[in-house]
């Protein structure tokens, strides 16, 4: 199962960027209150709706890219997490066509230290922010990740059909062209 991930935050950043759904532009949401940095490129899976009402989150094991970069990926596992708003799962991915990542097929193929580093980040990155918390977290394998992607796609399709969700991609007329007022 391949899918597109839109990167919002490159690996190594403390700045938390988000796609502004109204304009399609990248907005600085905040700088993390803790001295932690994102352990992988972080973004969302296109055409999904997670349990928290946002597109399903994704981490991509890749050299740092840039906000707005679109990467074709495949899931290798998922970090099941609950925060102050409820379920906030993070799908762990690799680029689909990267031969350097071909050996990573499921969560147990990821080095234990790398899993612990990602887990530690998500357990502490909200610690100093008032009203924010991480309640519980655990790793699950590729099949669970793919099942959650399918469920998130269904939630997205149902919400769009009901008219209760707007596509997080570039909004129509988000970048209107400047009208020529020279009279020429």
Residue ranges with predicted function:
Residues 1-184:
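Hydrophobic N-terminal alpha-helices or hydrophobic patches in metabolic proteins across all domains
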């Amino acid at each position: 199962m391949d899918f597109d991930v839109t990167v919002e935050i490159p690996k190594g950043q403390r700045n938390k960027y988000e796609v502004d759904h109204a304009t399609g532009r990248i907005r600085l949401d905040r700088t993390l209150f803790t001295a932690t940095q994102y352990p992988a490129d972080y973004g969302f899976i296109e055409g999904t709706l997670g349990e928290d009402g946002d597109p399903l989150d994704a981490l991509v094991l890749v050299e740092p890219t840039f906000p707005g970069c679109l990467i074709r990926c495949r899931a290798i596992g998922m970090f099941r997490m609950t925060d102050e708003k409820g379920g906030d799962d993070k799908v762990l991915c690799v680029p689909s066509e990267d031969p350097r990542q071909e050996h990573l097929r499921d969560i147990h193929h990821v080095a234990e230290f790398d899993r612990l580093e990602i887990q530690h980040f998500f357990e502490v990155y909200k610690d100093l922010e008032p009203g924010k918390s991480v309640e519980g977290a655990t790793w699950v394998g590729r099949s669970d990740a793919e099942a959650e992607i399918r469920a998130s796609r269904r939630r997205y399709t149902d919400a769009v059909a009901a008219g209760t969700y707007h596509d997080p991609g570039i909004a129509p007329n988000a970048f209107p062209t400047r009208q020529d007022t020279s009279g020429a």
